[in-house]
Structure formats: structure tokens, C-alpha cells
């Protein structure tokens, strides 16, 4: 297997991951922007944020409206533009920019606000998505998952599904959640979403994928954004995460996946085994790709540096194009734009989120289920960051906040930073018939694995 030829690079990964762990324990204030605007602007921003969320639920209606107009007409193109999920928050962020300028009677105020934000996460997701989607990395991930799948005495279409969505989701604890999401989405698209599966199975699978990736990053303290926001301040290390969160994530991922497999056994078992042979990639090239990926992950909070590494990586890809597939640059840019819009709008939501978290009557139960629900309408990393600002919060509330944030991370596209990457890859698959991913369908598909996560993260052995 190709990955066995890359021992040198693989042996170097633990050191790089240790570097990442040290880098990632910076205070949350270093990686989240501070809101300089107060008062009426915040309320208008919340109203626009609500409109943006509503927009994500009606993109399919805009797509239908586009078909009512002549092809190439202004209205047809306008409605197609509004139907693109990845640009929703970017559109409303632009409206917010103009609104700030008007309300402050100064374009400079709007410019200062944008320049005061921290767009490191969108940049990182863009870069890591492109690197993780390259042929050498995808082939390696597929080889590992296939190895695990063949340990199960089941047809490959069933065993690969189990291995990918249970054990594969845990990759996010080591290579970061965006990278794991990208790899799994690409593999699932080719093996399942483009193979004529029903829409019901498609939504059950994407819901399972989003939830499992969200909780699957909790085995370590440096890979899941909502954990990263609090780990440094609260002194949480990898042992703390593995012993309090990680084992629950493993159990929940496995049980949720087995539940979906049982519900769709007949359909999964009837699929044709993927006969596509991996295009050969030299071991040394796979090793170099892993080295670049690990370096980018280790430098996740230094965008100027990891972008330089990314430029070098693009040079490597160009020089070895005979072993490469087309880069996912457009997809990465769209996902980065989505997250940048979310950062722009989400940074002005502290005025209503923080009081909810800091409420003196807050109990562990309220915090857990409140965080799970709130995560559906706001990025879970922003939620845990705001919680880290509350002084004197008890250990029970700390656990409840983070556990709730990761539990609800699969309910919507905006709930967890890696979700737009998965949605961007899967929405063009045959399973969705060119209509994109329905937010309602995603929500319904994510509810069963979310309930399973609730069982393990809140009710089991606490």
C-alpha cells in the first residue's frame, strides 16, 4: 500500500501535531475577532443574521423561480445567484457592510469593522480543503478505510459505509475536522451519492456525516473549533478530552452509523461494489502531501505563513500533475466565502448570546440543551468562545457548553465550520438531482444521530 512507503513523513507527524497542540492553546481572543460596534448596529445585524438564516432555508425556492424565466435573462441569473447556498452569508454580509456605512455615515467605519475581524478560520478551511482533496491524500484515506472495512464480514458497500462514517469521522481529531470532512465527502460522493441512492438515504447519510464529524474531533484538544476556543483558557489537554468526550464520541459515531445501516440495509447491500481502481501515486509524493497537510494544520493560526506553505504546495502539484486530479479551488473559495460571511455577521451577535450563557440561573441541563439548540443557528465555535469569556463558570457548565456545541454541530450547514465543505462537495451529486441540499432534509437527517449523541454525551455515565 502506498501509505506504507511514506514512513518517514508519517513518523514526523506526531511531532508536527505536538507543535499544533502548542500553537492551538493560544487564548480564544487571539483567534476570534472583537466587536467594536455597539447599540443599534447590533440589533440591525441580528435582524440581517435572521434573514440570512431564513435565506438558507429558501434557496431551493429561488432555484425554482429561476426556471420560470428565459435562460440567460437577468431575472433567471439573479435567482440562480440567490440560490447558491455558499454565497448566502456573503450577500448578507455585504448588506451589513453597507448598513454600517449608512448608520455611521462613514464608509470608513464599515471598512474598519471588516479589517478588525479575524478571517483566519475561513482561510484555513479554504487551504486545508484544497490540500485534503488531492488524489494522494484521498487515496491514502480510502486505503485506510478499505483496510478497516475488509475486517468486517460484510459486503464492501456496507462495510465501507460503516468504516467511513464511524472510524473515518474520528480522523478529524488528528488532521482537523475540515480535512476529515473533505476526505469523507469525496469518498461518499463517489461510492454512494453518485450511485443512485434514494434521497432518504442521502439525507440520512449527510446528517450522520455532519454530526459524526462534529463530535469526532473531540478525542484531542486541538482539532475541533469549539474545543479549540476554550482548551487553552480552561486547561483542557488531550487526556481530558479523550476521557471526558472522546470515548463518548467513538461510541456515538459507531451506534449512529449502525442504526442507519440497519434502517437502510437492503439498499446499501444492493449497491454495486465500486470497481474503480486507484490511480497509482508514488509513496514519496503521498509523504510530501502529508507533510504539507500536517504543516498547514500546525500553523493553523498563522494565515500569512500557512498561505505561503500553500503556495509551495501548489507548485508541487503543478510539477507532479500526472499524479494529480484538478484542484478543488473553486469549491474551497466558495466555502471560504461562506465562512467569511458567517464571521462578518456572527461577530455582532454577542449582545444576545452572551447573556444567555452567563445567566445566573443556568444549570448544566439548560446549558447542554440550550447550546445544542443554539448551535443550529450560530457557529458552535462562536458559542463556546462566548462561554469562555464568562468568569467563574463551573466545571459542569463548561462540560455542558462544549458537549452541547458539538452535539448540535450537524443540525444545519452553519452549525459547524467544516459543514459547508461537505455540503459544497455533496450538493452536486446525483442523489440531490441538481437541486442542492434542502436545509429541512438535512435537519431531519441529522436528528437521529444528534439524539444518539445526546444519549452518550449527557445521559451515559456522567
Cite the ranges covered by each PLM segment.
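Juxtamembrane and boundary regions of transmembrane helices in multi-pass small-molecule transporters
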Residues: 1-3, 41-68, 140, 200-203, ...
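Low-complexity, highly charged intrinsically disordered N-terminal segments
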Residues: 79-148, 152-160
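Helix-loop-helix module between adjacent transmembrane segments
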Residues: 130-135, 155-156, 167-179, 211-220, ...
Amino acid at each position: 500500500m502506498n501509505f506504507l512507503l511514506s514512513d518517514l513523513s508519517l513518523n514526523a507527524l506526531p511531532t508536527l501535531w505536538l507543535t499544533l497542540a502548542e500553537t492551538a492553546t493560544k487564548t480564544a481572543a487571539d483567534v476570534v475577532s472583537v466587536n467594536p460596534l455597539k447599540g443599534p448596529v447590533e440589533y440591525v445585524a441580528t435582524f440581517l443574521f435572521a434573514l440570512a438564516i431564513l435565506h438558507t432555508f429558501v434557496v431551493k425556492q429561488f432555484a425554482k423561480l429561476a426556471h420560470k424565466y428565459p435562460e440567460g435573462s437577468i431575472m433567471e441569473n439573479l435567482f440562480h445567484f440567490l440560490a447558491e447556498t455558499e454565497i448566502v452569508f456573503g450577500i448578507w454580509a455585504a448588506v451589513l457592510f453597507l448598513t454600517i456605512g449608512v448608520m455611521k455615515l462613514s464608509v470608513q467605519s464599515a471598512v474598519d469593522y471588516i479589517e478588525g475581524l479575524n478571517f483566519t478560520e475561513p482561510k484555513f478551511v479554504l487551504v486545508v480543503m484544497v490540500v485534503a482533496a488531492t488524489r494522494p491524500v484521498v487515496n491514502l484515506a480510502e486505503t485506510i478505510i478499505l483496510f478497516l472495512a475488509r475486517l468486517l464480514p460484510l459486503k464492501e458497500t456496507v462495510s465501507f459505509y460503516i468504516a467511513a462514517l464511524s472510524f473515518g469521522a474520528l480522523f478529524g481529531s488528528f488532521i482537523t475536522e475540515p480535512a476529515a470532512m473533505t476526505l469523507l465527502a469525496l469518498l461518499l460522493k463517489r461510492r454512494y451519492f453518485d450511485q443512485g441512492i434514494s434521497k432518504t438515504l442521502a439525507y440520512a447519510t449527510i446528517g450522520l456525516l455532519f454530526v459524526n464529524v462534529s463530535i469526532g474531533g473531540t478525542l484531542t484538544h486541538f482539532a475541533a473549533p469549539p474545543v479549540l476556543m476554550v482548551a487553552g483558557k480552561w486547561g483542557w489537554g488531550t487526556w481530558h478530552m479523550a476521557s471526558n468526550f472522546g470515548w463518548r464520541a467513538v461510541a456515538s459515531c459507531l451506534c449512529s452509523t449502525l442504526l442507519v445501516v440497519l434502517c437502510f440495509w437492503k439498499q446499501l447491500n444492493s449497491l454495486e461494489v465500486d470497481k474503480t481502481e486507484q490511480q497509482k501515486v508514488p509513496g514519496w509524493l503521498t509523504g510530501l502531501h502529508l507533510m504539507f497537510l500536517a504543516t498547514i494544520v500546525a500553523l493553523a493560526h498563522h494565515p500569512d505563513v500557512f498561505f505561503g506553505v500553500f503556495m509551495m504546495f501548489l507548485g508541487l502539484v503543478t510539477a507532479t500533475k500526472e499524479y494529480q486530479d484538478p484542484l478543488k479551488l473553486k469549491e474551497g473559495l466558495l466555502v471560504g466565502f461562506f465562512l467569511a460571511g458567517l464571521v462578518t455577521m456572527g461577530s455582532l451577535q454577542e449582545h444576545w448570546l452572551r447573556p444567555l450563557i452567563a445567566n445566573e440561573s443556568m444549570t448544566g441541563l439548560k446549558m447542554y440543551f440550550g447550546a445544542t439548540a443554539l448551535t443550529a443557528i450560530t457557529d458552535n465555535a462562536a458559542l463556546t468562545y462566548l462561554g469562555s469569556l464568562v468568569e467563574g463558570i463551573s466545571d459542569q457548565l463548561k462540560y455542558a457548553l462544549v458537549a452541547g456545541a458539538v452535539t448540535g454541530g450537524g443540525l444545519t450547514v452553519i452549525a459547524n465550520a467544516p459543514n459547508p465543505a461537505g455540503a459544497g462537495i455533496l450538493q452536486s451529486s446525483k442523489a440531490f438531482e441538481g437541486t442542492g441540499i434542502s436545509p429541512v432534509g438535512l435537519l431531519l437527517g441529522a436528528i437521529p444521530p444528534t439524539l444518539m449523541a445526546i444519549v452518550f454525551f449527557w445521559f451515559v455515565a456522567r
